């Protein structure tokens, strides 16, 4: 199943689903699917929405900020809630705003810790289900650390992820050209770590990937860029 940004995805049949806010606001559709529990990773805009959902669904509300400076330390709480709901046969829907980053991160954390999939296997499994998945690099770094902890290896490190994302965004540009610019920027920021930290904090972005995108646009032009609905070009890095 290939998903669009409007769709939800079934990760485990009749047990675990994830996607965006749009479905979370459609009570009739949730009931049609059989959803009984919800994890909201963005927080409700007002208490009335929270009360409405609480009447019909078991709810875990986590207000998670989606930036490269944030990590995934919160994910264990979400995974424990998933365990509890699956144990009592309550199908659960995990969502963030667009179903790209926060919800995908929690699902990958679940697949790694409960299904014993490596980070690489978890990531590409979700990409097959929902091709717009693109967590920010802060969450990716946390999943890389989890990969090392669980499997004593990095099956897919931050450079692998960044290069994959860049190649996906610029499919008409030679991979070697992308890697050359990425490696140049990585070397520059490794040698200027104070500047790296300053830009990361000032712009709330991942400087290496962000700068590489800008360099690619400047060198090759926007006509080489793939326009993807639901996920901005810089999203994984800002």
Predicted regions and their residues:
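Short, amphipathic alpha-helical interaction segments embedded in low-complexity terminal/linker regions
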Residues: 153-238
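Short, small-residue alpha-helix embedded
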Residues: 103-113
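Short amphipathic alpha-helical interaction/hinge segments
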Residues: 104, 151-154
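Generic structural signal for isolated residues within well-ordered alpha-helices
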Residues: 109-110, 125, 165, 215
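Secondary-structure junction/capping motif
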Residues: 103, 118, 187-191
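Intrinsically disordered, low-complexity segments enriched in polar/charged small residues
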Residues: 100, 107, 233-234
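Cysteine-based protein phosphatase catalytic domain of the PTP/DSP
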Residues: 2-94, 98, 113-145, 150, ...
């Amino acid at each position: 199943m290939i998903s669009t940004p409007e769709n939800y995805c079934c990760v485990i049949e009749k047990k675990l689903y994830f996607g965006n806010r749009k479905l979370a606001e459609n009570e009739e559709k949730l009931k049609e699917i059989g959803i009984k529990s919800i994890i909201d990773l963005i927080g409700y805009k007002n208490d009335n929405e929270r009360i409405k959902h609480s009447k019909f669904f078991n709810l875990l509300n986590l207000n998670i900020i989606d930036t490269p400076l944030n990590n995934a330390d919160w994910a264990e709480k979400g995974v424990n809630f998933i365990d509890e709901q699956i144990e009592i046969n309550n199908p659960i829907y995990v969502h963030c705003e667009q179903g790209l980053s926060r919800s995908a991160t929690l699902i990958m954390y679940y697949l790694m810790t409960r299904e014993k999939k490596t980070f690489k296997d978890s990531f590409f499994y979700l990409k097959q289900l929902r091709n717009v998945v693109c967590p920010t690099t802060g969450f990716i770094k946390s999943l890389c650390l989890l990969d090392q902890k669980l499997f004593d290896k990095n099956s897919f490190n931050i450079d692998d992820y960044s290069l994959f994302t860049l190649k996906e965004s610029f499919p008409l540009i030679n991979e070697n050209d992308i890697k050359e610019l990425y490696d140049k920027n990585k070397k520059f920021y490794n040698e200027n770590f104070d500047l790296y930290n300053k830009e990361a904090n000032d712009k709330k972005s991942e400087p290496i990937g962000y700068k590489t995108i800008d360099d690619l646009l400047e060198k090759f032009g926007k006509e080489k860029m793939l326009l993807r609905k639901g996920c901005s070009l810089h999203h994984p890095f800002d």
